C-alpha cells in the first residue's frame, strides 16, 4: 500500500508539473478524495526531482551541446553560454524569496498557505492570470534574442510558485507570453528554468526535514522518484 501511494504521488506530480496547473493543489485534492496522507512540502519537493531528471533527459542536446566547443574548456562554456546565464539570473528571485520564507515564516507557508481555502483562492487567481496571458498578443521574443531582464522577470513570477496553488510552469509561461515571448520558446525556457528551482527546493527540504525522509525510507522515495520521471517524460 505504501508503494502504491508513492506511485500515485509520482504520477500526479509528473503529469501536472509541465501543465499549467498546480501539482501541489492536485496532490492535495486527490489525497483528500482518496483519504490518504497529504505528501506535504518535503515529500513533494523530493519527488519533483524526477521532473528535473526528465527535463535534463528531454533537453539533453540543449544542455550538453558542446559541439563546436572543442577549443574551449567546459568551465568557460558554462560561464559564457547565454542560456545558462539566463537560467542563473532567473533563479535568483526564487532563491531570495523561498529562502526568506523558509527561514523566517516556515509555519505560515506549511500550515496557512497549504490550507484548502488558500489553495482554492490562489488557483482562481492563477486561472485569471493565465487567461490574460492566453488573450495577449503573440510576441516574437525567443531564447536567442531575449534580454536578461526578461529572465529576471520570469524568474520573479516563478518565485511565486512557492505558494501552493500557483503552477510553476503556468505562471512562468504566462508571464513570458505577456512579456512578448513566442509560445514555444516560452514553454521551453520555463522547463529549463525549473531545473535549478526544483533541485534547490528539494535540497532545502532535505536539510530542514532530514528526520522525515529517514522515517519514510529510501525505497518508497525511489519508487516515487522513478514514477515522477516516467510520467514527466509523457507530459513534456
Task: List PLM regions with ranges.
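Multi-pass membrane proteins that catalyze or facilitate reactions on polyprenyl-/lipid-phosphate substrates
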Residues: 1-236
Amino acid at each position: 500500500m505504501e508503494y502504491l501511494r508513492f506511485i500515485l504521488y509520482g504520477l500526479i506530480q509528473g503529469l501536472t508539473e509541465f501543465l499549467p496547473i498546480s501539482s501541489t493543489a492536485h496532490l492535495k485534492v486527490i489525497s483528500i478524495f482518496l483519504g490518504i496522507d497529504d505528501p506535504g512540502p518535503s515529500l513533494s519537493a523530493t519527488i519533483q526531482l524526477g521532473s528535473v531528471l526528465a527535463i535534463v533527459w528531454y533537453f539533453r542536446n540543449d544542455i550538453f551541446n558542446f559541439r563546436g566547443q572543442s577549443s574551449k574548456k567546459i568551465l568557460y562554456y558554462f560561464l559564457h553560454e547565454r542560456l545558462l546565464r539566463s537560467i542563473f539570473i532567473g533563479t535568483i528571485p526564487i532563491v531570495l524569496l523561498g529562502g526568506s520564507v523558509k527561514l523566517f515564516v516556515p509555519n505560515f507557508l506549511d500550515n496557512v498557505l497549504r490550507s484548502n481555502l488558500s489553495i482554492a483562492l490562489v488557483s482562481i487567481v492563477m486561472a485569471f492570470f493565465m487567461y490574460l496571458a492566453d488573450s495577449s498578443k503573440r510576441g516574437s521574443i525567443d531564447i536567442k534574442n531575449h534580454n536578461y531582464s526578461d529572465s529576471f522577470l520570469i524568474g520573479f513570477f516563478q518565485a511565486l510558485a512557492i505558494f501552493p496553488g500557483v503552477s510553476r510552469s503556468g505562471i512562468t509561461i504566462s508571464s513570458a507570453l505577456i512579456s512578448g515571448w513566442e509560445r514555444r520558446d516560452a514553454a521551453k525556457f520555463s522547463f529549463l528554468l525549473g531545473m535549478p528551482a526544483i533541485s534547490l527546493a528539494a535540497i532545502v527540504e532535505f536539510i530542514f526535514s532530514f528526520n522525515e525522509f529517514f522515517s519514510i525510507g529510501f525505497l518508497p522515495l525511489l519508487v516515487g522518484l522513478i514514477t515522477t520521471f516516467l510520467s514527466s517524460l509523457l507530459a513534456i
